[in-house]
Amino acid sequence: MAEVESFTLDHTKVKAPYVRLIEEQKGPKGGTIANYDLRLAQPNQTSIETGGLHTLEHLFASLMRDRLDGIIDISPFGCRTGFHMISWYTYDTETVAKALKETLTEIRDSIEFSDIPGVSEKTCGNFKDHSLWSAKNWAKVILDEGISSDPFERKVV
């Protein structure tokens, strides 16, 4: 089996919430993408319930793109502790952490249900599984803890 970076990361050593550059990959025709770990919850201690995670996913898809160019995708981890963010550009982790902080602040302070993109049966594959209350609560928890630009040493932005 292929070695997968996230399965080699020592999840007992990281200190969430944080942003981590997992890797840069060069494509066979020359393009480069960057893969980030946006870890919101401490692994093996807590996880984000699916409704809140789903709502954060929809909001991040739009709000993070408002702040950072070149985002290809933002997708939740199966363990429900954070997200992969794939970008055409390699940003330093402090820049990504600041964008994430601004995004979570907007979610906590001003987002209403009508602001969430893609929450109808026509535009979402599981449209009934959203929770703005949970997304706002997690935004508050994450912001209160502070987002670090380093996964192992707290460097809060």
From Swiss-Prot:
Keyword Hydrolase set for record: no
Role description: Involved in the synthesis of autoinducer 2 (AI-2) which is secreted by bacteria and is used to communicate both the cell density and the metabolic potential of the environment. The regulation of gene expression in response to changes in cell density is called quorum sensing. Catalyzes the transformation of S-ribosylhomocysteine (RHC) to homocysteine (HC) and 4,5-dihydroxy-2,3-pentadione (DPD).
Species this protein is from: Oenococcus oeni (strain ATCC BAA-331 / PSU-1)
Summary of subunit composition and partner proteins: Homodimer.
Family membership noted in the UniProt record: Belongs to the LuxS family.
GO MF annotations, alphabetized: iron ion binding; S-ribosylhomocysteine lyase activity
InterPro entries per the UniProt record, alphabetical: LuxS_sf, Metalloenz_LuxS/M16, S-ribosylhomocysteinase
Residues at which Fe cation binds: 54, 58, 124
EC number(s) on file: 4.4.1.21
Keywords: Autoinducer synthesis, Iron, Lyase, Metal-binding, Quorum sensing
Name of this chain's protein: S-ribosylhomocysteine lyase
Superkingdom per UniProt: Bacteria
Top-level EC class: lyase
Cofactor annotation comment: Binds 1 Fe cation per subunit.
Catalytic activity: S-(5-deoxy-D-ribos-5-yl)-L-homocysteine = (S)-4,5-dihydroxypentane-2,3-dione + L-homocysteine
Magnesium found in the keyword field: no
Pfam families: LuxS
GO BP of this protein: quorum sensing
Cofactor: Fe cation
